[in-house]
């Protein structure tokens, strides 16, 4: 076999032409200290705050403290395999999470990796976890209702799309139940829901996912879970990952609901990280910027103007109180950031009033302008009625001789409390809510025994579906209250068929 010189020279020339003399420069440092999910490294002189860095074993970290001589890095994963002397290099990127339709129905960790065993997530869309909140000119005032399906909320403390409404209360007062019911109620509302579980037990998160699946709500929901067993950096990042995923849909003109369950645990994780990074502690040992931690997160909730697609992102942050103390540091911070709060009281919960909403301490600052007109008409006096009932109830315990007006107020108050009770995972459509509250406030329930109220409501709803579907559809579609005669006739006809308990 003969070797031809011209063929070899042509091949060599082709290879030389393809050769690229590009040089890749990596800034690499060395780990000088490691422990408790925190690493200190020197040699990364030009690293940026919030930049991703990569350790020798492939674990990622986030540069947080930029000090003279070293950098404090929070480790996003298992830190036990990293040791002193290991190399760490800059990536030049900030942290991003995957987003898009591929995540709907999935359970992911704060890094966007699936943890539900259903295979990898294929998506082209990534959003940075930190983003500047929309400015004043990019926003529009909150004017569309977000129906939770919970009578006590939709009537007393209505929530609008783009609002931030805090849900605050002791542990075991039904905070997560409100979140689940709200997600279930969005089935017909064209809303994408993101449930961020921070520091929850894995069994609790599993229970939430199964409840959503059973009620057909997982199809439009993303669950971001940073379990209690996860390292503190993941608990700190989880809410930012959730809102970054939601912003993708908001930018497309869609409506998003993000639930943070709960931010007390995120604040505790941030306190842990800050103390390990040797940042100076402040009140209750929290760092000085813990207010900014929550404000920059919650300010990203917005109702965008029409020019930007009119999308919205509604935030429902949760805060867990200790012995109903809402004047503690983190609760007062978040109350001052949000547009209102729903206060759940443990003594109400244990006395059987569920959802255990305290109407005196609960308020919605912008939701009133988003409330359905029909609901605004029928529920206008509900808050005052409840407040005066609570006051009279306290006085009536001391005396038995009550005048007729006081007695009728007490009777109405008892029925109001009963009507606002609701079973778990049973959200109500707005038309059913309007009709039962109309019946209550206009005195149609005054002659129904208190013990029969819940049964009366259930049977009324079934009767309306069978006999007055048109009336319900009208309220749901227009949001307006039909003529009084129509509703009164419907209630009166049903009352003729209702059998009171003997």
Swiss-Prot record:
Catalytic activities: ATP + H2O + 4 H(+)(in) = ADP + phosphate + 5 H(+)(out)
Source species, domain of life: Bacteria
Gene3D superfamilies according to UniProt: 2.40.30.20, ATP synthase alpha/beta chain, C-terminal domain, P-loop containing nucleotide triphosphate hydrolases
Presence of keyword Translocase: yes
Site (Required for activity): 362
Localisation: Cell membrane
Enzyme Commission no: 7.1.2.2
Swiss-Prot/TrEMBL keywords: ATP synthesis, ATP-binding, Cell membrane, CF(1), Hydrogen ion transport, Ion transport, Membrane, Nucleotide-binding, Translocase, Transport
Binding positions for ATP per the UniProt entry: 169-176
Membrane topology according to the record: Peripheral membrane protein
Record flagged with keyword Cell membrane: yes
Protein name listed in UniProt: ATP synthase subunit alpha
Source organism of the structure: Exiguobacterium sibiricum (strain DSM 17290 / CCUG 55495 / CIP 109462 / JCM 13490 / 255-15)
